């Protein structure tokens, strides 16, 4: 085993462990001494609380061992101990623990990291609020003078507020008309996913929010009375002790609807109130710098969701589940609207004795009297002179009837529609209109009647304006559900169909050209293709049922609830046409009329598919029947094509550098192609939480997109594991939403010619090719790599962690690399501190480029300074390298690897260690820093804290995994030479629980699962 020491450096001793999910950095860059002191002060408070809770909850001897283990994680604590290393002391202490103490240690360190995460979120929130204050108070006269020697805006990738971006644009003389055109067509869509599911239980997350709230109260007041301070501290200790006694692990595998409920929390607690604030901040900043520009609609930023609708590889997502998900979402929105309208009714106490009322509102009240005579009889006397309250009473009744209708639909299911809704007479025709709201426009029209009446009397109501903004953004649906399914499911279903129909040639036997010809022919006929009353295979029946459910969903909820169908592993044009044909069969697509209520979205994932994508789309754009079914957008009413780019599988296939470059090139080629056909393109970025899956700072990633590819439109996945860190607190949510929006505005309005520099593109193509070759030589061509990964990482135990409704592998029973999903692939490497998918291959590629021509190093430095795309790549690699711990990684290998494969595994480890050294050397030379993350002192402070504290969890995990995997031998917690073996035996369930708790703790420390 490689032992660490305080003097160790380079590959064997990493410099840091990032405090945020693989590159998600706080706003402050570089940091200030004041911020550092604030962090240190708050850190002391949290550490003191943690120690107090451990001493209260654990037996004295055990608590002292845990505190000693924490102390030993700091190398300076061992100075003067006869040269004994930190690792040796930690191993010695772990060896002396029984399983109950090991479990307590895993829980204690997990609690510690989660408290630190809460602390840092609060500091990031405070930093964002501080950044808003100067822009609000600063006017043109006091603004800092424009610096002509500053880097061009196209090269600036620091996050910016609305005020900062609009000021920069004005100083660059960007015309108001150009800004207004962009804002009018601004279309930002954030899509929440369940996978990788956040490892923290929903119950624990609730307790974390309570702790965060108490910490904010304790730290927000500079001079609290002593009693109040002591009371807040007592409440904090009480809440953390309750947290300590709460089970961190899911007792049962969460269902899809559990994941839906967890996701809806962020909308209920944060986003419903945050989104109107986002628009107000945009409007305020815009009015200062571009006073003549019309404000954008509230729906410039909306939400989607895959939770309950992503069925790719998840058999638990059935048509019934998707139907109930839609009902859950609508239920939440109706409950929120009911609360808002009740509050509004309390506020709008305007009497007709003292204010005029617009005639349209009075006319609507007369119509409502006919529709709802019971309400009129109940409320008319009370609100006889208060028309706004009376109107809002009618609105409340309709909302409550809509909620009842929604409950009926949820209970009945998609195949059994509820009883016909109650109706009311309209213009003397009985039963002409439903009493409940059948569309969001009806609700919005009622609210606008009230607003227009207020405006006509020179009154305004911010609460009403806020509600109208929320209605524009969320509708009744809350978020649009994207259906996602793997391409072969459709081709298999059509193959079974054509076999049943006894076509001369079954679909599965056709070549691609034959498939396309047959699909286009069928699309042009009105003849039904799928016969009724046929007993299909289970998979085919499910595929057909999804489209039937979609049709029913749109009929009841409107198109907004679900209008995108994502086809994962798209390879050819037939993959898209298959979905169109199945949609046509059920009435979602009508080629004869040129109408479609479903947008077919290909997802290109592998490098080969990314390279093939332009040719595939070119053929489809030239096909009239396909092009005519694209929806129209924008002032020019261009046909819109949404297209998704996959980061996860392309990285798993070819490595980090190659994947990112191929995606970059594909975007340019696809945008050029779409423009040549007069098609508007909306790129959907399937970004994960980790660097290897496209994660990292969203603002940096958006600014790194090729110039001209956004044009105000972007769609991005927000992975389950990062939702809490981005949307768990109101100001953090606003910070994330504001920086995403400003990045889209900046990228769309400021032309970046650097993407078109031929020499830079040629260099990137070379290094991407070299990186891919080196990555594939290890990951795909080395016959021992799969065994190495399965033995040296906790991948098998990860599959037993009850955090997700989706299986870890695509195919049951398969144990090869291709069957493993990208998320557990990354999770396994992260837990064992290799983090290989996020950096391997980069060092060799860059080193070979510099070795061929030493002057290329200067070019690489210029790229890092001037090109946002290259700076993003290096920044992500730098952040990932700071998390790598080769000492600990080698301990995983030597302790968990099969002794018979030791030589092969040592060879693999040497390849990894050598590549780490090359990558570290080149990154430091390119950035000009002497150590990783050297440009941000505050980040380093947090990084060093996590780096020294997470180590014991790694040793604990290895000890528990060894026992778990070899119960016959029952090895001790550690095998230090000369120590007697621990003969205690434990059940498999006890050992598995301990191992899973270490997974929890390390994920909390790394703030990342997959």
Swiss-Prot record:
It is an enzyme of class 4 (lyase). Its cofactor is Mg(2+). GO terms for biological process: carbon fixation; oxaloacetate metabolic process; tricarboxylic acid cycle. Residues 1-18 have a biased composition (Polar residues). Keywords: Carbon dioxide fixation, Lyase, Magnesium. Gene3D superfamilies: Phosphoenolpyruvate/pyruvate domain (1.20.1440.90). Residues 1-36, 132-154, 967-986 are annotated as: Disordered. It catalyses: oxaloacetate + phosphate = phosphoenolpyruvate + hydrogencarbonate. The keyword Magnesium applies. GO terms for molecular function: magnesium ion binding; phosphoenolpyruvate carboxylase activity. The active site is at 195, 652. Pfam families: PEPcase. GO terms for cellular component: cytosol. InterPro entries: PEP_COase, PEP_COase_bac/pln-type, PEP_COase_Lys_AS, PEPCASE_His_AS, Pyrv/PenolPyrv_kinase-like_dom. This is Phosphoenolpyruvate carboxylase. It comes from Parasynechococcus marenigrum (strain WH8102).
């Amino acid at each position: 085993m490689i032992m660490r020491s305080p003097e160790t450096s380079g590959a064997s001793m990493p410099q840091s462990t990032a405090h945020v999910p693989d590159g998600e950095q706080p706003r402050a860059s570089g940091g200030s001494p004041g911020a550092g002191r604030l962090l240190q002060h708050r850190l002391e408070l949290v550490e003191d609380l943690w120690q107090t809770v451990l001493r209260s909850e654990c037996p004295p001897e055990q608590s002292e061992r845990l505190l000693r283990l924490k102390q030993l994680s700091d190398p300076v604590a061992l100075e003067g101990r006869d040269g004994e290393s930190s690792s040796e002391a930690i191993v010695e202490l772990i060896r002396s623990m029984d399983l109950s103490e090991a479990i307590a240690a895993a829980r204690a360190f997990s609690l510690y990291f989660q408290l630190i995460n809460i602390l840092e979120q609060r500091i990031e929130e405070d930093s964002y609020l501080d950044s808003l204050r100067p822009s609000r108070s600063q006017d043109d006269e006091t603004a800092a003078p424009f610096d002509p020697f500053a880097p061009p805006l196209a090269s600036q990738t620091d996050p910016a507020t609305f005020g900062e971006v609009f000021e920069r644009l004005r100083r660059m003389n960007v015309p108001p008309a150009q800004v207004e055109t962009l804002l009018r067509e601004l279309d930002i869509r954030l899509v929440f996913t369940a996978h990788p599911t956040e490892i923290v239980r929903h119950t624990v997350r609730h307790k974390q929010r309570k702790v965060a709230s108490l910490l904010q109260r304790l730290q927000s007041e500079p001079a609290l009375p002593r009693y109040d301070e002591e009371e807040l501290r007592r409440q904090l200790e009480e809440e953390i002790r309750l947290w300590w006694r709460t089970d961190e692990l899911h007792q049962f595998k969460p269902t899809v609807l559990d994941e839906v409920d967890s996701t809806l929390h962020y909308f209920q607690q944060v986003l419903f109130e945050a989104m109107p604030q986002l628009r107000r901040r945009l409007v305020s900043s815009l009015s200062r710098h571009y006073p003549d520009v019309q404000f954008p609609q509230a729906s410039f930023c909306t939400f989607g969701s895959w939770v309950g609708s992503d069925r790719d590889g998840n058999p638990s997502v059935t048509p019934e589940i998707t139907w109930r998900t839609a009902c859950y979402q609508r239920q939440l929105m109706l409950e929120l609207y009911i609360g808002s309208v009740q509050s509004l009714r309390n506020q709008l106490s305007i009497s007709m004795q003292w204010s005029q009322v617009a005639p349209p509102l009075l006319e609507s009240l007369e119509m409502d009297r006919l529709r709802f005579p019971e309400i009129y009889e109940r409320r008319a006397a009370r609100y006889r002179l208060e028309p706004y309250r009376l109107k809002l009473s009618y609105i409340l009744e309709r909302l409550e009837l809509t909620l009842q209708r929604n409950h009926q639909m949820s209970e009945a299911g998609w195949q059994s529609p509820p009883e016909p809704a109650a109706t009311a007479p309209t213009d003397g025709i009985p039963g002409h209109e439903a009493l409940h709201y059948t569309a969001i426009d009806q609700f919005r029209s009622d609210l606008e009647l009230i607003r227009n009446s207020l405006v006509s009397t020179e009154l305004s109501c911010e609460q009403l304006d806020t509600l109208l903004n929320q209605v524009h953004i969320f509708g009744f649906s809350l978020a649009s559900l994207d259906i996602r399914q793997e391409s072969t499911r459709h081709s298999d279903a059509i193959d079974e169909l054509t076999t049943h129909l006894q076509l001369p040639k079954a679909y599965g036997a056709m070549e691609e050209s034959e498939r396309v010809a047959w699909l286009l022919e069928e699309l042009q006929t009105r003849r039904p293709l799928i016969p009724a009353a046929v007993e299909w295979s289970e998979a085919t029946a499910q595929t057909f049922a999804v489209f039937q459910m979609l049709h029913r969903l749109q009929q009841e909820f409107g198109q907004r609830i679900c209008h995108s169908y994502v086809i994962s592993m798209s390879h050819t044009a037939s993959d898209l046409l298959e979905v169109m044909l199945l949609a046509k069969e059920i009435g979602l697509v009508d080629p004869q009329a040129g109408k479609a209520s479903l947008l077919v979205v290909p997802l290109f994932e592998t490098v080969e598919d990314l390279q093939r994508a332009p040719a595939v789309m070119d053929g489809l754009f030239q096909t009239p029947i396909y092009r005519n079914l694209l929806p129209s957008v924008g002032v020019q009413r261009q046909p819109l094509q949404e297209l998704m780019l996959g980061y996860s599988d392309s990285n798993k296939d070819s490595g980090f550098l190659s994947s990112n470059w191929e995606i970059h090139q594909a975007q340019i080629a696809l945008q050029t192609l779409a423009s040549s056909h007069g098609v508007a393109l909306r790129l959907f970025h399937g970004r994960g939480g980790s660097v290897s899956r496209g994660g990292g700072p969203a603002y940096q990633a958006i600014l790194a997109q090729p110039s001209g590819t956004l044009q105000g439109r972007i769609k991005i996945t927000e992975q389950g594991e990062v939702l809490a860190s981005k949307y768990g607190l109101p100001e953090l949510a606003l910070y994330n939403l504001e920086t995403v929006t400003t990045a889209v505005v900046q990228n769309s309005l400021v032309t970046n010619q650097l993407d078109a520099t031929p020499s830079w593109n040629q260099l990137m193509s070379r290094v991407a090719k070299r990186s891919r070759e080196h990555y594939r030589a290890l990951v795909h061509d080395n016959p021992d790599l799969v065994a190495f990964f399965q033995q040296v990482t906790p991948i098998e135990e990860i599959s037993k962690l009850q955090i997700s409704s989706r299986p870890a592998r695509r195919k049951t029973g398969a144990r090869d690399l291709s069957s493993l999903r990208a998320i557990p692939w990354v999770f396994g490497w992260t837990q064992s501190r290799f983090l290989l998918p996020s950096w391997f291959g980069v060092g060799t590629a860059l080193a070979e480029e510099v070795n061929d021509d030493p002057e290329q190093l200067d070019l690489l430095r210029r790229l890092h300074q001037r090109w946002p795309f290259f700076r993003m790549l290096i920044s992500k690699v730098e952040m990932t390298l700071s998390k790598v711990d080769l000492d600990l990684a080698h301990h995983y290998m030597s302790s968990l690897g099969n002794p018979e494969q030791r030589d092969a595994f040592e060879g693999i480890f040497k390849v990894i260690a050598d590549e780490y050294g090359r990558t570290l050397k080149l990154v430091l030379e390119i950035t000009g820093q002497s150590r990783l993350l050297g440009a941000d002192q505050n980040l380093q402070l947090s990084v060093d804290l996590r780096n020294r504290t997470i180590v014991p969890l790694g040793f604990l995990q290895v000890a528990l995994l060894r026992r778990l995997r070899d119960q016959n031998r029952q090895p001790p917690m550690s095998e230090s030479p000369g120590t007697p073996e621990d003969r205690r035996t434990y059940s498999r369930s006890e050992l598995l629980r301990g191992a899973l708790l270490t997974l929890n703790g390390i994920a909390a420390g790394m703030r990342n699962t997959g």
